Amino acid sequence: MTISRQFTGLTLAGLFLGLSLSAQAFSPSVQTGADIRRTGFGVPHIRAENERGLGFGIGYAYAQDNLCLLANEIVTVNGERSRYFGPEQLTVEERENRISDVFFQWLNTPQAVNAFWQAQPAEVRDLVEGYAAGYNRYLAERRQQGLPQQCQGEWVRDIAAEDLVKLTRRLLVEGGVGQFAEALASATPPQAMANIENNARAYQLADTRLQRFALDRGSNAVAVGSERSFNGRGMLLANPHFPWVGGMRFYQMHLTIPGKLDVMGAALPGLPMINIGFNQHLAWTHTVDSSKHFTLYRLQLDPKDPTRYLLDGQSLPLSKQTVTVQVKQTDGQVVPVSRDVYSSQFGPIVQWPGKLDWNNQFAYSLRDANLDNDRVLKQWYAMNRAGNLKDLQDSVHTIQGIPWVNTLAVDDKGQTLYMNLSVVPNVSTDKLARCSDPRAGLKMIVLDGSNSACAWDIDPHAAQKGIYASSQLPQLLRKDFVQHSNDSAWLANPAQPLTGFSPLISQDGQPLGLRSRFALDRLATLSKKGLVSVQDLQHMVMDDQVFLATQVVPDLLKFCTSQSEAALKSVCSSLKAWDGRANLESGVGLVHFQSIMQAMQESPQAWRVAFDPKDAQHTPRGLAIEKPEVAKALREAMLASAEIAAKMGLTEKTRWGDVQVVSSGGQQTPIHGGPGTLGIYNAIQSVPREDGKLEVVSGTSYLQVVTFDDKGPHAQGLLAFSLSSDPASKYSRDQTEAFSKKQWSVLPFTEQQIKADPQYQVQTVRDDLEKTGKVAAQ
């Protein structure tokens, strides 16, 4: 399938918008294809002679396992959900269809998609076009058999390369304007404020989702070097925390082009390359960073017209883009509904009642640095092919395509690398002091939109206008260790703090998250005992220690000794019996601990030892139970927890595995782990169900521990939610059950390992109209 500019001779738009929708516009005489070799848990090892064939194999294999998931995401990123499912149904991300459609119609215009495509190198185009063709081949075959029950509508269709570009652009803005879809789609000039009131439900959902964003997209990573590893080689733990459903659900695979590419790991839907993984000489992972990837601009509006703004004293009109969404009515008819999206020269207007109001005096524009990032696919493919750590580092320095994550890596020589080299707006500390609204603080950067001097600075050495050059961003190369769990770059290794950066890049002197404190504490303990082993890294995740419990449980139990109320005694008894972990067999004390500490952590006065930037690894800690106000708050939190447990139907005999589960195909699997906010490294987010249980929605996803010897990599891993999202697939629960039992799997990488796997089978798929692949037992 190709995307190309078309001359129609009739309209200027044709020059820019002509996108071929044919998914197989290639010479029929050229036959490409791939071998899809599956091993344990169905993991595909895809081998082809070139990128087109490799992409074909990836798309085919992915469709075998996740046909309906990708079909659904394609509808979403094309802004067509209201057309097929009605305007008020919620997406997987709990966003109303009508809001989602307006946002994606605005984001993925033909001009934007075509510009992205034109920037791609030939190898990336071949991968993407091959992926679309492979997906379509399997879809055609599956139609003959009958489509899965969950995707038997007209919305399931062949895809094209531009659909995959739209998926990629959605990924890019996850850390920016993607969090403000409601605010963008509903922004209305002051005369029409009634429309805002009608969107109260949408904003409530958006507010909840925004608060949960960091929890759903976190990660842990530890890279151990030659000075600390058991064999003097590099060793990497990758533990990304991502959604278990939808368009951010990882897929496990191994990609090979003989003599050019050999890489294994996991990728997000629609991406024909590995995001997190390893090859012959190195392993890498990502953690969601704390850097800013967008800024807001507060516009000073023209007193005569709220659709005009003042810039350097000159009145300028807001541009207006009319977005038309096809909407299915209750009678089944589909009618067009139009919506205007307003923008200043800084970006789209976003309106959030009570937070970002558009009135007669001010409005807010959002500028997302990743909207101009067309380098992300090129970046990951270069990382996939890196022959050593320097190659990987150089590619990230040069391409600057990493959108909103840190990179941690190791090599077979024993080096470790940390890079906070993502796409960050170039706003210096001095400019921030001159241009930002101090009332907004540093959580959300708000710059002065009436002064052109407050625009992002331009560094000629950066890969993109308005972002920091890679040489100005934090990075660390060491031989002992680097680690990260979604804090700033500051203490990736406490022996060499990274300081002095713009607050948009990294803030030092701030409290560490509890997962970071756990990791630093565990690594210090391991260092005292000796060298770090593979099992040590596995245990960091799988022993499910609740780090916060080590800091406060003694105070909780001391408080309990003075309590006599029956409800409090029950809570205290559970806390005393609890093992301080989030294992399946851990007691109901974990539920009480979570409820109590969620309430207590909201008060800085609750800590007995306050945060000290000179001792960030060990503070804050302890509960100041001797303070009357803290004792009162603690008592109230315990009573509230007793009520919650009663409503959930929990007793002192309840175990954590009875409470937290994941459902698939009518079956439930108990899941260990818990909230990362409690310092549980194996971070799992779950939401209440009507039956009193908690349903897992995100958290530990793809797990890998990789080390090396003279022959290459040795890896163990798991995909916690399993390979397939189809409940009918035999690969939909198998790895989930293994994860529940804490059973790691050896990841076969060499040809000998792959073919020796007891579950080995191979399917050859050809990219032509005549032949289809057949499964052959080997």
From Swiss-Prot:
Matches recorded under InterPro entries? Ntn_hydrolases_N (IPR029055), Pen/GL7ACA/AHL_acylase (IPR014395), Penicillin_amidase_A-knob (IPR043147), Penicillin_amidase_dom1 (IPR023343), Penicillin_amidase_N_B-knob (IPR043146), S45 (IPR002692)
Alphabetized, the UniProt keywords read: Hydrolase, Periplasm, Quorum sensing, Signal, Zymogen
GO BP annotations, alphabetical order = antibiotic biosynthetic process; quorum sensing
Q: Which reaction does it catalyse?
A: an N-acyl-L-homoserine lactone + H2O = L-homoserine lactone + a carboxylate
Q: Which GO terms describe its cellular component?
A: periplasmic space
Q: Where in the cell is it found?
A: Periplasm
GO MF term list: hydrolase activity, acting on carbon-nitrogen (but not peptide) bonds, in linear amides
Prosegment location in residue numbers: 196-218
Q: Name one Pfam family in it.
A: Penicil_amidase
Which family does the UniProt entry place this protein in? Belongs to the peptidase S45 family.
Further information in the entry reads: AHL-mediated signaling mediates quorum sensing in many species of Proteobacteria, regulating hundreds of genes, including many that code for extracellular virulence factors.
Q: How does it assemble?
A: Heterodimer of an alpha subunit and a beta subunit processed from the same precursor.
General function of this protein = Catalyzes the deacylation of acyl-homoserine lactone (AHL or acyl-HSL), releasing homoserine lactone (HSL) and the corresponding fatty acid. Possesses a specificity for the degradation of long-chain acyl-HSLs (side chains of 11 to 14 carbons in length).
**Protein name in the entry:** Acyl-homoserine lactone acylase PvdQ
Q: Which organism is it from?
A: Pseudomonas fluorescens (strain Pf0-1)
